[in-house]
Structures are given as structure tokens and as C-alpha cells.
């Protein structure tokens, strides 16, 4: 029987993008949803959580929220957890997540705030949390949610560098879950351009990247601006991801360049 500790470890690593069961094994486990299998969980067994969430929302807002139950059935990975508090939290995350998915003229956007905020970009988009959003959206059965949102950031006016954002690492994480090489390689040149733009604006002769604390999504903090571990870890991760993409694209020159870059940061 799986323990609470081991389940938390598995789920944390899997949702964060670690290859805990090979490159696509974790994806296959979480995305398996063919209802003709006797081993498949029945979504109806978890419907009660969503009605509880909707009732709590109604109590706060004073209006009955829409409950798109079929969307959850069609999209989310259903899991059964021995600890029901963890299980309820898991399903609440999907309940709240779907509210942030917007369909726009530029494709799918997953916003950070339900209400429009003045510090956001077009369609209330904010690149700061996109890495987290893509790591969650990649588990949805409709791959377009993650892939369209990733592509959104490389369309005119989307400002992917308005905040620190591990773009290449996120796109590669989506690929690990979906196996869609075409999607990943289509964004490959844009991800290289994005990395080089960061080098021009935020890297100096030391090889390290500097960032303003607010733009690093840490608000105004005592640490202030400068060489921050966060932005440098993002760029290190992006260099690794681009090198791996280059390998899949049979581009040894770019692979070598970005393997060198990751060693500098």
C-alpha cells in the first residue's frame, strides 16, 4: 500500500516535471483515462468534491457558479489517494485551475488573477507564473490548453520577458508529458531567440544574470536587485532544455552551444 509520504513524493516530482518513471511513464499513468479498463477510476466517485467547492463558492459570492463537470471528466487525471484531505486538495486545484483558462484571439491564456489587474499584459496575461501553469496544464487530456498557451508567449505583444520566466524548460516539460515533438520543435527557434534576448538585457561579463526583485516575482524585498539565484537557475534550466531540444532536432551545433551556456551560469 502506498504511504502518504511516498505518494506525496511521487506526485510532487511528477507534477514538477521530474522523470520519476522514465520520460513518458509518469504521463501515461496520470493521463490514462480510458473508461473501458477495469483499472480506471470512475470520475463520478469524485463528483462530490466539485459540488462542495461550488457550494462554498456560492456561499461566498452569493451566486451559483457554473460547474462544468463534463470538462473535468474529459480533461483531468483522476487519482485516488489514501489521505482524503490531500485528495480533496488535489481536486480543488483543478476546480480553480479551469476558471483561469481563457480563450482569446491569440490562443489560450491561463491567467494568474480572475479579475484584470493593471500590471498584467494583453488578455490579463502574466509570464511570472506561466512555468507553473504549463506544468499543470500539460496533464490535461486536451493538449491544446498547454500547447496553445506556450505558443501565445511568442506571438507579437505577449512580453515573455516582462517577468522572470523559465520558458524553454516549461515547453520541454510539456513535451515530456504529451510526446508532441512537432509542437516543441516549432517553438524551438523562438526559445533560442528568447534566451539570447535575456543574455543581451540581463547578463554581464561574469556570465551571471541580474534581475530586479519585483520583476523576479519576489515583490520589493530586502535582497533587492542584482545577481539573484532564481533568475540564474531559470536560465540554467532553459539552457539544459534547449540543448535537449537541439539533440532531438539533430542540431549538434546548437546542442554544444547551450551545453556550454549551462556551464557558465
Language-model features, listed with the residues they occupy:
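N-terminal secretory signal peptides and thylakoid transit peptides that target proteins
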Residues: 1-15
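Generic, well-ordered alpha-helical scaffold segments in large soluble proteins
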Residues: 14, 92, 96, 100, ...
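C-terminal segment of N-terminal export signals and the immediately downstream linker at the start
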Residues: 21-40
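The feature captures the catalytic groove of carbohydrate-active enzymes
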Residues: 38-39, 44-58, 157-165, 199-259
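Substrate-binding groove/exosite segments of carbohydrate-active enzymes
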Residues: 55-186, 192
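Active-site lining segments of carbohydrate-active enzymes
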Residues: 106-132, 175, 184, 188-205, ...
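Conserved small/polar residues in nucleotide/adenosyl-binding loops
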Residues: 264-265
Amino acid at each position: 500500500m502506498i504511504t502518504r509520504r511516498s505518494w506525496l513524493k511521487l506526485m510532487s516530482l511528477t507534477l514538477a516535471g521530474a522523470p520519476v518513471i522514465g520520460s513518458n511513464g509518469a504521463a501515461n499513468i496520470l493521463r490514462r483515462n480510458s473508461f473501458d479498463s477495469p483499472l480506471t477510476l470512475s470520475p463520478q466517485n469524485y463528483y462530490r468534491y466539485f459540488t462542495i467547492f461550488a457550494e462554498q463558492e456560492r456561499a461566498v459570492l452569493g451566486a451559483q457558479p457554473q460547474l462544468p463537470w463534463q470538462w473535468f471528466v474529459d480533461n483531468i487525471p483522476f487519482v485516488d489517494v489514501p489521505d482524503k484531505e490531500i485528495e480533496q486538495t488535489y481536486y480543488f486545484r483543478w476546480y480553480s485551475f479551469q476558471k483561469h483558462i481563457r480563450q482569446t484571439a491569440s490562443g489560450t491564456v491561463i491567467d494568474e488573477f480572475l479579475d484584470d489587474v493593471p500590471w498584467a499584459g494583453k488578455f490579463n496575461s502574466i509570464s511570472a507564473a506561466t512555468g507553473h501553469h504549463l506544468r499543470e496544464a500539460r496533464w490535461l487530456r486536451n493538449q491544446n490548453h498547454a500547447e496553445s498557451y506556450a505558443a501565445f508567449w511568442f506571438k507579437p505583444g505577449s512580453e515573455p520577458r516582462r517577468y522572470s520566466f523559465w520558458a524553454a524548460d516549461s515547453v520541454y516539460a510539456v513535451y515530456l508529458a504529451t510526446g508532441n515533438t512537432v509542437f516543441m520543435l516549432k517553438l524551438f527557434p523562438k526559445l533560442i531567440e528568447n534566451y539570447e534576448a535575456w543574455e543581451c538585457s540581463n547578463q554581464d561579463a561574469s556570465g551571471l544574470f541580474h534581475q530586479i526583485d519585483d520583476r523576479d516575482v519576489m515583490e520589493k524585498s530586502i535582497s533587492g536587485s542584482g545577481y539573484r539565484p532564481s533568475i540564474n537557475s531559470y536560465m540554467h534550466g532553459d539552457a539544459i532544455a534547449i540543448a535537449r531540444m537541439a539533440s532531438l532536432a539533430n542540431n549538434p551545433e546548437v546542442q554544444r552551444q547551450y551545453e556550454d551556456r549551462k556551464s557558465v551560469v
